[in-house]
Amino acid sequence: MKKVPFVTLDKLQEITAQFPTPFHLYDEKGIRENAKAVKEAFAWNKGFKEFFAVKATPNPFLIQILQEYGCGCDCSSMTELMMSKAIGCKEGDIMFSSNDTPEEEFKYANEIGGIINLDDITHIEFLDKILD
């Protein structure tokens, strides 16, 4: 199957005449199709939830589209946590995966109901102290 761009050269030239560059142009239909495909692929696993890495594309409009398909937000900074909360993520919708993280970021992630994902066993004792 031959892949074709979601926008023609003529349409792209029309867009660039109207909007200054640089800008990002997203394929909403393609994003929705892929999010739906992931959701359907794992539908057999009732506990499965996909978490989108916010740092990959910190665009609240795209993240809201992904939320429509059951995706949560994988955050790695205070800014990403705050954005995810601001766009309506609820408890359990946020995964916080962060390295070399200030105490206040762990506290905030916990406060908003984030799932704290650790990659270092020594953080367990640290979190136990600060999240009491």
Short names for language-model regions:
Residues 1-116, 122-131:
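A charged N-terminal "starter" segment
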